[in-house]
């Protein structure tokens, strides 16, 4: 089953959605879902000494400006296994450019993590959490000779707008 396409739309509201985890927090392995099969494939091992600061994946039934499902970082007190479904809510978004293309990453929190589920907006997190995420995305491709530019860290309302935009883009691409 391809988790990108076969999660019921009713389970994917902008303010309450299931994220599919591709990469667990602390990993240097860059996995991506194979769009054709839905299988997880190893894209590369990060060239830098950095590791993913949060669990990383995508929101099913979305189509982002970079031609992939919308990325999501899931802040959680534990590592989450790849291909797990995690019910989350958005608290913000990091907007960046990756090789000249817009690349937005939703920041989300699992409803069932008592360490994080009191936060409703990225502005409520300790400053260091957002700084660590920004730093990771600034440097994680540098030794590959690729440039990334982190431009904005925006709150929950902007994240919800981006999720809606990417859900609508998915409908236009795959459901019409």
Where do the protein language model's features map onto the residues?
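Hydrophobic N-terminal alpha-helices or hydrophobic patches in metabolic proteins across all domains
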Residues: 1-176
């Amino acid at each position: 089953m391809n988790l990108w396409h076969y999660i019921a739309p009713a389970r994917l509201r902008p303010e309450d959605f299931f994220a599919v985890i591709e990469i667990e927090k602390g990993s240097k392995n860059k996995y991506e879902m194979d769009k054709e099969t839905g299988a997880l494939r190893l894209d590369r091992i990060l060239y830098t000494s950095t590791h993913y600061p949060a669990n990383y994946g995508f929101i099913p039934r979305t189509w982002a400006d970079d031609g992939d499902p919308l990325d999501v970082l899931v802040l959680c007190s534990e590592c989450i296994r790849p291909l797990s479904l995690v019910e989350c809510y958005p608290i913000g978004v990091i907007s960046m450019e990756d090789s000249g293309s817009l690349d937005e990453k939703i920041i989300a929190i699992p409803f069932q993590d008592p360490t994080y589920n009191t936060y409703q907006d990225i502005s409520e997190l300790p400053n260091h959490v957002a700084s660590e995420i920004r730093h990771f995305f600034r440097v994680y491709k540098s030794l590959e000779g690729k440039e990334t530019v982190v431009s904005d860290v925006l709150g929950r309302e902007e994240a919800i707008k981006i999720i809606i935009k990417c859900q609508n883009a998915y409908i236009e691409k795959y459901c019409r």
